[in-house]
């Protein structure tokens, strides 16, 4: 099998999970409403079991099936967002896609009843209760666990670039936080988060997981919440670093970018040209810059040992993945990444709306509108 055939042999499939805010149409506050939303009212069958509660009752998560390419993924995302929007409107609610709500207080949100969430809250207390954040997770199918581990090691370098493109959480509890991705800093309070360290093999990773289970730290590897991980139950590498993207087109673009990066790294792996693996501490420096400044900052090019504007580095990244994007047929979706570089992210738009109106309600109204574009 050639390296290109390996990309197309039922691998590098896509699965996309989106976490949405449930917002009261009148108050624009988050509403603890997910149980009512999903209990089976008219139109519920459109979601076909692909939506579920999260820890807070004001959060609803949707997930595509296993998609063979980005076009199938887009079709499923349109259907899921559209169905969710329709259901929410019937109950006087609206759906918002963003990494944090601009002003709602976590202390006013109900926790979903369930053994898993009870255990998390019992263990983490207010760290868990305050974790009122919303993310985008992209799964890329990789059958061989050793290959998956190698790709998870190597893709870490590009995670700050991807985060910068996704930033959508500039507000927290009714204040500008000064960060483009407030969500990232809130989630840091959880254990077992952030950029993971390097693992020599999948066996090395599994021994780490086994030790945590044996010592009572976790009951299974799903409680390892790193920015990228080999999924414990699926044959995928899961990229978890993104803020929830507001526009559907941006979700599609970032999913295509994640797939293309994984594909390019696989091609290098098959050619014995593996990408250099950098230390966790170095990549965390770049992650902080993406959290703070988004696309307006500079990341460190560790090869050149100098700071480079994020927009320039993302442009280089798009050139780097051109080969795999052509194989996957995702060049059109990646053109949207260039538009994000030009137009800015959801965080930039939210800040502009607030600067113009001085109204968090206006920010939420704009988010509601932007979250339904393309449906």
Swiss-Prot record:
It comes from the Bacteria. GO terms for molecular function: ATP binding; glutamate-cysteine ligase activity. One of its GO terms (biological process) is modified amino acid biosynthetic process. Its EC number is 6.3.2.2. Keywords: ATP-binding, Ligase, Nucleotide-binding. Gene3D superfamilies: 3.30.590.20. Pfam families: GCS2. It catalyses: L-cysteine + L-glutamate + ATP = gamma-L-glutamyl-L-cysteine + ADP + phosphate + H(+). It is an enzyme of class 6 (ligase). HAMAP family: Glu_cys_ligase_2. Belongs to the glutamate--cysteine ligase type 2 family. YbdK subfamily. ATP-dependent carboxylate-amine ligase which exhibits weak glutamate--cysteine ligase activity. This is Putative glutamate--cysteine ligase 2.
């Amino acid at each position: 099998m050639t390296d290109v055939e390996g990309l197309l042999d039922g691998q590098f499939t896509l699965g996309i999970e989106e976490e949405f805010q449930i917002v009261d149409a009148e108050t624009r506050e988050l509403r603890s409403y997910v149980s009512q939303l999903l209990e089976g009212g008219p139109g519920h069958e459109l979601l076909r079991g692909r939506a579920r509660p999260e820890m807070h009752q004001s959060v609803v998560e949707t997930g595509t099936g296993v998609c063979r390419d980005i076009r199938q993924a887009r079709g499923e995302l349109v259907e899921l967002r559209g169905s969710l929007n329709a259901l929410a409107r019937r109950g006087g609610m609206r759906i918002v896609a963003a990494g944090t709500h601009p002003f709602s207080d976590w202390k006013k949100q109900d926790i979903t009843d369930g053994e898993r969430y009870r255990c998390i809250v019992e263990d983490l207390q207010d760290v868990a209760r305050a974790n009122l954040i919303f993310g985008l997770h992209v799964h890329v199918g990789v059958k061989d666990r050793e290959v998956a581990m190698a790709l998870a090691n190597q893709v870490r370098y590009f995670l700050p670039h991807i985060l910068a493109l996704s930033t959508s959480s500039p507000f927290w509890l009714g204040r500008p936080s000064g960060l483009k991705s407030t969500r990232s800093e809130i989630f840091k309070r959880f254990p077992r988060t952030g950029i993971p360290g390097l693992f020599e093999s999948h066996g090395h990773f599994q021994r780490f997981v086994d030790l945590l289970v044996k010592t009572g730290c976790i009951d299974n590897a799903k409680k390892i919440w790193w920015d990228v991980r080999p999924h414990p139950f699926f044959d995928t590498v899961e990229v978890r670093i993104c803020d929830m993207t507001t526009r559907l087109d941006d979700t599609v673009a970032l999913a295509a970018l994640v797939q293309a990066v994984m594909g390019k790294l696989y091609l290098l792996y098959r050619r014995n040209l593996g990408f250099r693996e950098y230390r966790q501490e170095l990549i965390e420096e770049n992650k902080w810059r993406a959290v703070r400044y988004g696309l307006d900052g500079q990341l460190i090019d560790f090869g050149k040992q100098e700071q480079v504007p994020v927009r320039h580095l993302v442009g280089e990244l798009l050139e780097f993945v051109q080969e795999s994007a052509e194989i996957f047929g995702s060049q059109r979706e990646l053109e949207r990444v260039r538009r994000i570089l030009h137009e800015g992210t959801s965080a930039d738009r939210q800040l502009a709306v607030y600067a113009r109106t001085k109204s968090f309600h206006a920010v939420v109204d704009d988010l509601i509108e932007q979250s339904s574009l393309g449906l």
